[in-house]
Amino acid sequence: MRKGISIPILLAVSLSLLPAAAPPQAEIDNSLLNAKLYLPDAKHGYYQGTRFDWSGVIYSLEFEGHNYYGPWFNRTDPNIHDFIYDGPDIVAGPCSAVTGPVDEFAPLGWDEAKPGGEFIKVGIGALRKPADAAKYDNYKVYAIADPGKWSVKKYRDSIEFSQELSAAGYHFLYRKTARLIPGKPEMALEHSLKNLGTRAIQTNVYNHNFLTLDHHPPGPGLTVSVPFQIQSNHPPNKKLAEIRANRIVYLDILKDRDVVATPMEGFTNKVGNHLIRIEDTRVGAGMKIQADRPLLRESLWSIRSVIAVEPFIEINVAPGAEFTWKSTYEYYTLTR
């Protein structure tokens, strides 16, 4: 068994007289891929929003001179809801200011939580429901009542996160591993959710997959393809992109406030439909995402600085049971 380096998660409030600490981070490498990640930390962490899972925000992944992930925004502002355009800048709010392939879980226990009570976001913790909240808002920062017990173990080519939380009637152990596959330009994101309580866990999760390939704006030469004929009741702006059978093809460079977004329907419950290819002939690189669970739904969203294909899966975990899922990312170059 390999010995990992245990990294303490700093959840206590530090002395105000100390200088601001840099966000804790880690680096993993398999000689083909190099990835850099921010670590979960309630005080000094890079991401402190209450929308996305805190376990391992990948802010850089390099392969053959290409970089796949990085900030899609120029700066952040705690007063922004989602993001805005401010002159030439894209300004992200605290819940959206994140990078790379990040997971967002649907909240647990929101409806039954009383004002001031607690609800759950897996990968974040038990959050406080405001007194004036009518419905859940994933762009709002909620107070964290209990972050749970976190641990991180780092190896040369992988990093393991775990969070145990007992709150709001739920008790679970969540694990996530970012693993670079030996001898291959591939990264696996391996997840498990074990129900340690007496209440069933019913939720869903998707990966936002913020892709900023070499920081080129989406445009002609960029395609998204899947194994099924894409159907959409809200197709993209026909001047910017179009659906062609199983592909979405970009027709013009996204600029200013351009948006290409569409639901991607037409898949079946076969696991083989959970596969995505994104290729850009302008930069000569691409990636394939393949998962081992059937799709619940899928959508595409892109602006001038980023493209994101968002696959959802359903999660149902009975008391005492464990649910696992894995997504494999393959990175490659294209022959020009």
Go through the PLM ranges and name each one.
Residues A22-A188, L196-N204, H208-R336:
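Surface-exposed acidic/polar loop and edge beta-strand patches at domain peripheries
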Residues P8-S16:
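Bacterial N-terminal signal peptides
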Residues V13, A21-A22:
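Intrinsic disorder/low-complexity segments
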Residues M1-I9:
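Bacterial N-terminal signal peptides that target proteins for export
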Residues M1-R2, S14, R175:
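Short, intrinsically disordered low-complexity segments
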